[in-house]
Regions:
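The feature captures the catalytic groove of carbohydrate-active enzymes
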Residues: 1, 41-94, 108-175
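Carboxylate/His-rich catalytic cores and anion/metal-binding grooves
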Residues: 2-45
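Short, flexible loop/turn elements at secondary-structure junctions
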Residues: 11-12, 28, 50-52, 123-129, ...
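Short, solvent-exposed positions on alpha-helices
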Residues: 15-18, 90-94, 98
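Long, well-ordered core segments of solenoidal/helical folds
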Residues: 22-35, 98-114, 180-192
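Anion-binding catalytic surfaces of enzymes that hydrolyze or transfer phosphate/sulfate esters
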Residues: 34, 62-69, 200-209
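Long, low-complexity segments enriched in small/aliphatic residues
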Residues: 172-209
Length: 209
């Protein structure tokens, strides 16, 4: 759904974003329940799909989609990009930042620090794609797919930028988010020259995906 709105502002149809933003407002409520019950985390999250009723829990039967917990974070970035296009400070302060704050809060609890000191999402997946593991098994669940880390890099950067624009003096909050941002795993290159879709250099089962 989010991708269908990418051109709304550019096409002079910015007001058409409102139903999506209203849905995201509802997801902060349902997603806070899911965050607590599924992950024992604060803030809110949403998964790969939602419904008219703003369901935030995993849904569907395709193994490479439902358990992706980054849906809300991805939508938050769209809210921030709407601000960048419109420079509507009221929208940034009263709509985008409160939602982004709740999304960032979720990842404060959800992220896992590995032995290398990187903060990883997981269990997660690279939506709608699967890999072949080093033992030859086809799989979807993994830790820290590249898409997750990239979305988080955008989300944390956007939230820090929003605090700066609004003149918010919250040094402890800023330092914590900056530390999380710095601890995200870097984008890696595979042995055959690709940007790695997963944290490990797995073989793609659908190279054209």
């Amino acid at each position: 759904t989010e991708m269908n709105y990418w051109f709304a502002d550019k096409a002079g149809l910015g007001e058409c974003n409102e139903p999506l933003f209203s849905l995201l407002d509802k997801l902060t409520l349902t997603g806070s329940v899911v965050a607590k019950k599924m992950y024992n985390a604060g803030g809110f999250c949403a998964h790969h799909n939602t419904t008219l009723w703003a369901n935030a829990a995993p849904e569907g039967i395709f193994d490479a989609s439902p358990f992706w917990p980054m849906g809300a974070a991805w939508l938050c970035i769209h809210m921030y990009e709407h601000y960048l296009y419109t420079e509507d400070l009221s929208f940034l302060k009263n709509r985008a930042m409160p939602v982004m704050k709740k999304s960032v809060r979720f990842f404060e609890d959800y992220l896992y620090r590995d032995d290398d000191g990187h903060l990883l999402t997981g269990p997660s997946l690279s939506p709608e794609n699967t890999y072949r593991s080093h033992t030859g098994q086809k799989g979807a669940l993994c830790m820290a797919p590249t898409m997750d880390s990239t979305i988080l890099r955008q989300l944390f950067t956007a939230y820090l930028h929003g605090l700066e624009i609004l003149g918010e003096k919250e040094p402890e909050v800023k330092n914590k988010i900056q530390q999380m941002l710095d601890a995200l795993p870097p984008i890696s290159i595979s042995k055959d020259g690709r940007i790695m879709e997963w944290y490990q250099d797995f073989e793609e089962t659908e190279p054209g995906h």
